[in-house]
A protein has these predicted regions:
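Terminal amphipathic alpha-helical/low-complexity segments used for targeting or macromolecular assembly
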Residues: 1-5, 10-11, 16-17, 53, ...
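Structural signal for interior beta-strand "rungs" in well-ordered beta-sheet cores
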Residues: 1-186
Length: 259
């Protein structure tokens, strides 16, 4: 159902089962999947693609131009939002900077009020961004990570899956999977509460603890230590291997450190 006051461009694709609220705007080229709900004053810009069951709340803007001084507004790029993701009030999601590329939001995410996802970010499934969280351009956030309120993440950083970043943290370095980050690039160990809530087996948690202590040794590089641990072939769980492999990737090679 489309409210009479909504502005839906004829070139937009809106599934008949979607609900478009009062004064919402859907621009040409936007795609709204089955069962989506756009609240009053929600805005979908050209290039916004919503999977099934996505909720876009009041005054949220999906698909706005990147805040990049070199960006050409004529660039045909996208924001894709996975099924059942909830986008709350005043959230801003910016489209990618290059032609035929996308800022990607996974399925079953929750983007709380006032959070911002900049151009070219990639969020895995089940990510939660709390109120006022800000992600710079090209940030990657792994599945089921929780980024708390007021957190600022520098461009090109990676936030590992299953990690928890505490409120008002400043992150300019990579946070490992299942890590517990706080303050300014500080690490308080593993997110053990989150691991247990997700039902991660005890064997995997034990391997994560072993990997954590193997990689974080004073005065030694995390990447080299992670490579040595993997070469030993002693890690049998996906969680343990993923933790170590994280240190071999990324663009910046800098990681949050234990406080």
């Amino acid at each position: 159902m489309i409210h009479p006051s909504a502005l839906v461009h004829p070139a937009a694709q809106v599934d008949p089962s979607a609900e478009i609220g009062p004064f919402a705007i859907v621009e040409a080229g936007a795609i709204v999947g089955a069962g989506c709900r756009l609240a009053a004053h929600a805005i979908l810009k050209a290039g916004a693609v919503l999977g099934a069951g996505v909720v876009v709340d009041h005054f949220a803007v999906v698909g706005g131009d990147p805040q990049d001084l070199s960006f050409d507004p004529s660039t045909a790029s996208r924001v894709t939002v996975g099924a059942r993701t909830v986008i709350r009030e005043h959230v801003t999601l910016h489209r990618a900077t290059k032609p035929d590329t996308a800022t990607v939001i996974g399925a079953d995410c929750l983007l709380m009020a006032g959070s911002h996802v900049a151009h070219d970010c990639v969020l895995g499934d089940g990510v939660i961004l709390a109120n006022g969280c800000m992600l710079g351009g090209h940030v990657h956030v792994g599945a089921k990570a929780f980024v708390s309120g007021g957190v600022a993440v520098h461009q090109f950083c990676r936030i590992g899956g299953g990690s928890l970043t505490s409120g008002n943290a400043v992150i300019t370095e990579d946070v490992p999977p299942d890590g517990l980050a706080h303050g300014r690039n500080e690490l308080a160990g593993l997110n053990l509460v989150g691991l247990r809530r997700r039902g991660v087996p005890a064997e995997a948690i034990a391997e994560l603890k072993r990997a954590y202590h193997a990689v974080y040794r004073p005065g030694q590089g995390c990447a080299a230590l992670a490579q040595a641990e993997l070469a030993g072939g002693a890690y049998r769980t996906a969680e343990g291997r993923a933790f170590l492999e994280f240190f071999l990737g990324g663009k910046r090679g800098r990681f949050v450190q234990p406080s």
